[in-house]
């Protein structure tokens, strides 16, 4: 009986072992349209301040034209700017101009999303180690967050990370607060310059005592500078300074939350504990 030809043993096809992939890097939600990122209440407040001045002048019978005085503008507004230029170092003045927009468009606040991001990082660190976070460093847009994550990947001690980030936090907070105080100082100088403008106006009136027909108009024009000084200080400069300080405080609290989250990851805390700890910053 003929034997069947020898056949090479069949081997099952090779199947690649599935390698678990790390979760995709956190990406913040798309930036909302400009008008949605605006602080509507601040915008309404500034507009109401103008309406209050113009409307009050009209209701009092003074008219809109009485609010304009080139001499008062030069003495009060330009004088205030001149005093601030002498008062403030150039870097602080430039910073003040750059953060003035925060009154209408404050920095985006995504603290809830940031908590989720840090919790995701803690899960990656528990499964893959701190080096598993290295691919995520380049994706960070916030320099403070990027620096902290890089130090975490580099394996620095938790206290070293805290010390370095707190120095950055304190330095940035000091710079921004000094910039906000520029508007606070303008609110101090403007009323005083308004009084100076009124005195100049009264001096001009005293020179025309021989012509009684000019006295009423001259006295009214003299007090326009006082209006400029008091109104600009209490309706614009001082509220702007207070709003900027509030925004700066919020940014500092957000960075404190980042520091606590990164330290917790470095210490190997449970992600649930980290989430509970950071939730306290959201209240």
What are these regions (language model features)?
Residues 37, 44-47, 51-64, 168-247:
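Helix-termination/interfacial motifs at the ends of transmembrane alpha-helices
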Residues 10:
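Detector for the Zn2+-coordinating histidines of canonical Cys2His2
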Residues 34-35, 41, 52-179, 251-283:
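Large intracellular
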């Amino acid at each position: 009986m003929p034997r069947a030809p020898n056949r090479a043993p069949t081997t099952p096809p090779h199947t690649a072992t599935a390698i678990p992939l790390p979760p995709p890097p956190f990406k913040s939600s798309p930036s909302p349209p400009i008008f949605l990122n605006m602080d509507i209440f601040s915008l309404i407040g500034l507009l109401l301040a103008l309406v209050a001045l113009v409307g009050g002048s009209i209701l009092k019978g003074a008219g809109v034209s009485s609010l304009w005085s080139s001499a008062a503008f030069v003495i009060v507004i330009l004088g205030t700017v001149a005093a601030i230029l002498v008062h403030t170092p150039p870097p602080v003045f430039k910073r003040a101009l750059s953060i003035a927009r925060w009154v209408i468009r404050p920095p985006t606040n995504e603290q809830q999303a940031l908590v989720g991001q840090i919790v995701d990082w803690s899960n990656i660190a528990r499964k893959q180690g701190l080096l598993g976070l290295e691919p995520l460093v380049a994706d960070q847009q916030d320099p403070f967050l990027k620096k902290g994550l890089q130090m975490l990947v580099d394996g620095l001690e938790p206290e070293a990370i805290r010390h370095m980030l707190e120095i950055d936090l304190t330095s940035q907070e000091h710079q921004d607060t000094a910039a906000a105080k520029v508007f606070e100082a303008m609110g101090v100088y403007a009323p005083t310059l308004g009084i100076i403008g009124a005195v100049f106006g009264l001096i001009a009136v005293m020179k025309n005592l021989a012509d009684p027909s000019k006295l009423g108009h001259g006295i009214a024009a003299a007090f326009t500078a006082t209006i400029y000084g008091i109104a600009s200080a209490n309706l614009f400069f001082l509220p702007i300074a207070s709003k900027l300080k509030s925004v700066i405080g919020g940014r500092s609290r957000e960075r404190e939350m980042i520091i606590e989250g990164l330290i917790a990851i470095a210490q190997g805390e449970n992600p649930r504990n980290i989430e509970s700890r950071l939730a306290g910053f959201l209240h």
